[in-house]
Amino acid sequence: MNVMTSVFALAAALAIPAAAQLAVPNDAEVSLGHIHLYVSDVAEHQKFWAAMGGVPVMNQKLAMIQFPGVFILVRKAETKGGTVGSVVNHFGFAWKDLPAAMAKWQTAGYKIEQSQDPNHGYIAGPDGIRLEFSGDPSLQVPVKINHVHLYPQDVPAMQAWYTKVLGGVPGKCVRERAPDGIDCVEIPGASLAMSKSETRLDPTPGRSLDHIGFEVKNLPEFLERMKAEGVNITQGLTPSNFSSKMRVAFITDPWGTKMELTEGIAP
């Protein structure tokens, strides 16, 4: 075990888990689970996500960065590019004390993009990760994921697919920059926001955001339903290489969004 891994494991052992862990699943037994990033420098990402408020945790051999509602996983790998240009353009978090968080980011030298709204903007993460931020003083925790933003050519079709497959609730989600609402599908843990793209964007595999993870209770039964509905299952039920209590599978949506289905990702 190298020094960086040892430090990460020690921090994980001492860390107090962030409020709860993942959201209570919906009627389809699905909730947001994780976001998996392919990165050039794991240590740089550990530093970045710590600055965002993440806490290192371990599920046996699986190192993760925990936020309320989601785990961030990082893996060293070559990529085809950042999030912009892929069907998943960015994802977003809300901070209870945004001015304090922004002061920390500025001290660390991270690039911040804002318009006239002091309560909203974007931060440029390593490897072309685009992260949206907003302030929400009503939060019960310091920071929480609030959405993943997808850009299909056909928004109603994508809404219908995620509603049927993941049991999400379609509607409008209100954001700082869109008070009238953005088309979305609500999944426990976060909104899947959807905006129309004039062209078909790149699929996520091989990008810095390689895939989105959803935690599923009773994964074998869920996969049987996926087969019956004709969902593209790219990898069937498989034991995890990192945790004996976890099993995984992979599916892909019709727009090229790679998704990992997990059961047992939480420590």
Question: What are the residue ranges of the model-derived segments?
Answer:
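Amphipathic alpha-helical segments
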Residues: 40-56, 101-108, 154-170, 228
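Well-ordered beta-strand scaffold positions
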Residues: 70-71, 190
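N-terminal post-signal-peptidase region of extra-cytosolic proteins
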Residues: 74-77
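Mature N-terminal segment immediately following signal peptide/propeptide cleavage
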Residues: 26-60, 64
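Vicinal oxygen chelate
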Residues: 20-27, 30-40, 63-66, 81-150, 172-197, 214, ...
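Bacterial N-terminal signal peptides
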Residues: 5-18
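N-terminal secretory signal peptides that target proteins for export/translocation
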Residues: 1-2
